[in-house]
Amino acid sequence: MAYERNVDSRQPPELHLISALLALESTGYLISLAKQCGGGVITEEIQRLLLNYCITIFSSSDFPNTLPIRNLAKSLINEVESSGGVVLDEIYELCSSLMTSPLESSGSKSQRVLKRYSFLFPDTTTLMIPLISSTNMLEGDTGCSVWPASLYLSEFILSFPKLFENKSCFEVIYS
């Protein structure tokens, strides 16, 4: 018997899946969350949810880097097919169009991605913070996006905004 439930991108676990997708988490993690949403398998409803977000969010991004979508589409097809499920035709079409289009050039615009970090509050408030990041490790950035303590600090600041009202934040640079 198939696992059936209503898919709502504003409620957990779908909300967690979409938040991870917007933050460009690894495909393995996204597949794991997608399976949680579907009760152990990636249902057609979850595939459609992922497809809609891939097309609407990443296709209209200010920094269109198709590599994350490409990797997710391939992993999604592989996972659904290996579990004996049915892959949506639209996902095959998306994957084939991404596979036949050339990779972005090495220009600076294509080497940037727009990650969106979501902070989810118990009162259903969601705060999304966009972060433009380089895909080139040699180009560098602050590193705060991958530093776990920065996430905890951000959550603390968002939980107690009065403590940080009219305060400034700066980065210490050692030379």
Locations of regions flagged by a protein language model:
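S-adenosylmethionine-dependent methyltransferases
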Residues: 1-175
